[in-house]
Amino acid sequence: MTEKENLGGSTLLPAYFGEFGGQFVAESLLPALDQLEKAFVDATNSPEFREELGGYLRDYLGRPTPLTECSNLPLAGEGKGFARIFLKREDLVHGGAHKTNQVIGQVLLAKRMGKTRIIAETGAGQHGTATALACALMGLECVVYMGAKDVARQQPNVYRMQLHGAKVIPVESGSGTLKDAVNEALRDWTATFHESHYLLGTAAGPHPFPTIVREFHKVISEEAKAQMLERTGKLPDVVVACVGGGSNAIGMFADFIDDEGVELVGAEPAGEGLDSGKHGATITNGQIGILHGTRSYLMRNSDGQVEESYSISAGLDYPGVGPQHAHLHATGRATYVGITDAEALQAFQYLARYEGIIPALESSHAFAYALKRAKTAEEEGQNLTILVSLSGRGDKDVDHVRRTLEENPELILKDNR
């Protein structure tokens, strides 16, 4: 099976974001992608579909999610500036993370297409959990591919998926992480697409997946924009979200992209440091290439081979990134920065200690950047409003954090009061 770009025919929606995106897939998958794109366009133009989706978002997922202003952080120093940090609470979505937003959309779409089986991949287990609960709700078979390493470090989510009736398949090949789970899911879909829908969990993959995922997640920024205007009377100065594959971030950025006065920042996993060889900062430190059917930035070695990515957070441990993020970086519309494991762990503890919220380690990367920007603003005499996508809750990470801090006591938060 060879992979080549789909050069035949045209797509209904733009397949590229600048030079990034496309459909670099086996020819046997092109009919499935064409069918999916047509079904998505038809569905989003259907008032009945939009009404049904809106009902699930409201009555099952609990949308709109709240906007919480951090009120107890010990930030104020000697500077004359003042920073306000607001959290868009995607951790309060049913399922525990932003993932369920677009999963409900895709499962409804799959049912509309007559599919009876859903295939998914998962890293931290949040996407797999969201897919499993949506399939349980709508009576569809669910198969989840998960890297063997991730199965080991995310046992609670594995059991949750199984409770919902999903079959979880550990992937031992390669590095045993998210990249390898995606490969196996794509192989399955290639063989079974007549009855199966591949529910991709991030804003990457071949067209039309990046567009579908963005559109179903755009509700995050649509709500947040309205909430910020109501609460503060203006748009935020900075919007920050963590970026692995980039789904929560593109949902958080989407409605702000045309607002040039709003700075967009993606927090990538710098792991043990950008020079350590152990990180997943694809845009900050990667090269352009093709992975999982799309042209974007990748973690690649000097031979051009895709490298293993690394992050303390399983959900950010992906060696590629969505093509729209690559385009936002290339055009300068968004900035992408590396946040280390140590910085994320500090932010995790900070939010728990001072605001009573336990964030996912993924979200902790975004919050760590917000803390840095807030401190700098106050030192430099700036007044700054920062909006953070709190993309998921941290229940799944508590044991991992506890073990890590026991092994590295120097990272335990010192009380700043």
From Swiss-Prot:
<protein>
    <recommendedName>
        <fullName>Tryptophan synthase beta chain</fullName>
        <ecNumber>4.2.1.20</ecNumber>
    </recommendedName>
</protein>
<dbReference type="Pfam" id="PF00291">
    <property type="entry name" value="PALP"/>
</dbReference>
<keyword id="KW-0822">Tryptophan biosynthesis</keyword>
<dbReference type="InterPro" id="IPR006653">
    <property type="entry name" value="Trp_synth_b_CS"/>
</dbReference>
<comment type="subunit">
    <text>Tetramer of two alpha and two beta chains.</text>
</comment>
<dbReference type="InterPro" id="IPR006654">
    <property type="entry name" value="Trp_synth_beta"/>
</dbReference>
<dbReference type="InterPro" id="IPR023026">
    <property type="entry name" value="Trp_synth_beta/beta-like"/>
</dbReference>
<dbReference type="InterPro" id="IPR001926">
    <property type="entry name" value="TrpB-like_PALP"/>
</dbReference>
<dbReference type="GO" id="GO:0005737">
    <property type="term" value="C:cytoplasm"/>
</dbReference>
<keyword id="KW-0028">Amino-acid biosynthesis</keyword>
<dbReference type="GO" id="GO:0004834">
    <property type="term" value="F:tryptophan synthase activity"/>
</dbReference>
<keyword id="KW-0663">Pyridoxal phosphate</keyword>
<comment type="pathway">
    <text>Amino-acid biosynthesis; L-tryptophan biosynthesis; L-tryptophan from chorismate: step 5/5.</text>
</comment>
<comment type="function">
    <text>The beta subunit is responsible for the synthesis of L-tryptophan from indole and L-serine.</text>
</comment>
<dbReference type="InterPro" id="IPR036052">
    <property type="entry name" value="TrpB-like_PALP_sf"/>
</dbReference>
<keyword id="KW-0057">Aromatic amino acid biosynthesis</keyword>
<keyword id="KW-0456">Lyase</keyword>
<feature type="modified residue" description="N6-(pyridoxal phosphate)lysine">
    <location>
        <position position="99"/>
    </location>
</feature>
<comment type="similarity">
    <text>Belongs to the TrpB family.</text>
</comment>
